[in-house]
């Protein structure tokens, strides 16, 4: 690997360890030429599937759309940005791990709901109310009762 400081081609690995719950390898490297040290992360590259919308259209997975919808549900909630990033990373990992070329949008919605349920119950209800198209207070009540179980 090239050194990011002097662009020399030879570097050596000083230390390797697992990171990101075992899904990445963190390596400390040292440049043979300039002796600078830097960190790299190695992970398997898996393609994200296309999303099949409810109307049958297919579109590439849109990370921005997922981030916006989760952040909208989490607006004014006491949740750290790193926790939101972890939920997003977990959703992306789960989508890649499916190994499917296409996934229904409902699957992405359910993964988002699962992540929010673990993170913040109020945000979960907010997201569910839009995603599941709640029509009346009874549907809110049923979903809240499920959370209490």
UniProtKB/Swiss-Prot annotation:
Where does the ATP-cone domain lie?
49-139
Q: Which UniProt keywords apply?
A: ATP-binding, DNA-binding, Metal-binding, Nucleotide-binding, Repressor, Transcription, Transcription regulation, Zinc, Zinc-finger
Give the record's GO biological process terms.
Answer: negative regulation of DNA-templated transcription
Cofactor annotation comment: Binds 1 zinc ion.
Tell me the Pfam families matching this sequence. Answer: ATP-cone, Zn_ribbon_NrdR
Q: Which cofactor does it need?
A: Zn(2+)
GO MF terms here are: ATP binding; DNA binding; zinc ion binding
- Zn-finger regions (unnamed) at which positions? 3-34
The source's domain of life comes to Bacteria
Family annotation (InterPro entries): ATP-cone_dom, NrdR-like_N, RNR_NrdR-like
Q: Which family does it belong to?
A: Belongs to the NrdR family.
What is its biological role? Negatively regulates transcription of bacterial ribonucleotide reductase nrd genes and operons by binding to NrdR-boxes.
What's the protein called, per UniProt? Transcriptional repressor NrdR
